[in-house]
């Protein structure tokens, strides 16, 4: 098979995969509880239109509370659309309002531990993430999505086995335009438990030191 034939075959397979993704996309319902936060984002977008070709950070409170983004990624055009307490399906549900309109060059996504804490299984969380990818890539097929691994935490240490299983499943995804950033091992101390100074007093949300650690893993993807 010639190089040209291989190129055409690769293009055909990519188009076929893209068509399959579109046909299997499922948009979850938009929960009213998040409407005030989403409307606040939309109001901000109207008064201060977000810049094009930005890096979009989206997900749960671990993204929303990342107030040092600009300092951690100097010179990078950023948008933060984290909303606290949300699960993966919530970001999918509101993707038409807080993801797709921005046409970001890169999406950095963190969510999943709220899902597990709510009683969902690793298989369910994995399914929600693959659906998120399907929905987003149906509209933005060449936008890379970086999944920050679900973190270990003091408050949810009992969920560590489910967290590790979920991370393992997501890390194995072979799709193009997907990356998995594994911050889990680096958040553990010599005794194998989460480092206390990487968390706020609630033992759940990241401290500034933790965000600096995360940034060191993510930064290479932004260049």
Regions found by a protein language model. Name each.
Residues 48-50, 97, 114, 130, ...:
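Extracellular glycan-modifying ectodomains
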Residues 140-144:
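A short helix->loop->beta-strand "cap" motif at the edges of active sites that frequently abuts
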Residues 56-58, 79:
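Conserved beta-strand elements of the Class I
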Residues 16, 154-223:
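Catalytic His-Asp segment of secreted/periplasmic serine-dependent ester chemistry enzymes
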Residues 63-79, 88-126, 146, 150-154:
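Oxyanion-hole/transition-state-stabilizing segment in secreted/luminal serine hydrolases
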Residues 1-55, 63, 67, 71-72:
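N-terminal secretory targeting modules
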Residues 122-132, 162-167:
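Charged helix-capping and loop-helix junction motifs
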Residues 58-59, 112, 183:
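A secondary-structure boundary/capping signal
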